[in-house]
Amino acid sequence: MNHDDWLSGQLKDDAFAAHYLTQAAQDLEPAVFTAALRHVIDARGGLAKVADAGKLSRQSLYKAFPVTGKGNPTAKTMFAALRASGLQLTFKAA
């Protein structure tokens, strides 16, 4: 099994996906978080499934979360994609 297949399998687990996104967010580089969220979306059925579940346009998701990780999703799109992936954003004191 290659790394991408292993990661995709792990990202189906809510706790692992939450930890993965938390670590990506701590990098403070938006492209890292955007790429990580794309990995989670792909592992959970892909952009088409998340678009349907989140009532988002597929085109807007493909633009917001390109494979390169260089998308620039709006907060609305990012929160909707997280919810449609079964996750939510939370905050805690540093």
Show the residue positions of the predicted features.
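N-terminal flexible/basic segments that precede or flank functional cores
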Residues: M1-H39
